């Protein structure tokens, strides 16, 4: 069914108040957008930062009369009689179906394919990971995930123990197992990620080789031959001593979730534990690799 969309130009100080008022007026969905294309790359844990110029976007049922709502908004001192807004009708879409229609099998490196569960496998003789991302991040389409998958494909993982730090959908963990890893430990702060990783491991018949933990539950003596962490620069720096402790001497490391301009600083920081290689790049993103000293 169609929807009525109300867009209000405001600022970060007032956006939350407007959002609360619109929910009271019957809005079924509220989102915030950047009013002036100003990026926020990496909020601190627990923060939900907003842009200085923020657009509040509210959806209402198509039958909703917004006249009283707009009249109420005009009485707010921080908006005023002539506040900037736009009302339009938008058609509903089956967004899940649209996304599924555009997610096709993708090859990474020479052996590895990531195949959506609803698509036919292009090469049955290849190493195929059958993926249903569900609620967690990680389909292989993002440059950071692609960089990590290409790196895993380049390794000989036979009889290797692997850690996937920030496992998300489990795509890297499952790929490592399908590429021959002895076992993989996946760690994530999100229960949904743990569930999605488990489901994708079961779909690929490798669940018996995958152990999944929240950070506080991971074994204290956990060690691996290979560790991959596709998270963000801030957590990578904060977790560096723990990540280094988890990699065996001579073991291999891959870090991603980094913007190009962040890569050198993180590489320099990790060099106290690892012999770091030259960074690899894809679009605006980077991957760092190294060997444990």
From Swiss-Prot:
Its EC number is 2.1.1.-. One of its GO terms (cellular component) is cytosol. It is an enzyme of class 2 (transferase). Pfam families: PrmA. Its main location: cytoplasm. It catalyses: L-lysyl-[protein] + 3 S-adenosyl-L-methionine = N(6),N(6),N(6)-trimethyl-L-lysyl-[protein] + 3 S-adenosyl-L-homocysteine + 3 H(+). This is Ribosomal protein L11 methyltransferase. GO terms for molecular function: protein-lysine N-methyltransferase activity. It is found in: Cytoplasm. GO terms for biological process: methylation. Keywords: Cytoplasm, Methyltransferase, S-adenosyl-L-methionine, Transferase. S-adenosyl-L-methionine binds at residues 145, 166, 188, 230. NCBIfam families: prmA. The keyword Membrane does not apply. It comes from Shewanella baltica (strain OS185). The lineage of its organism: Bacteria, Pseudomonadati, Pseudomonadota, Gammaproteobacteria, Alteromonadales. SUPFAM superfamilies: S-adenosyl-L-methionine-dependent methyltransferases (SSF53335). Belongs to the methyltransferase superfamily. PrmA family. Methylates ribosomal protein L11.
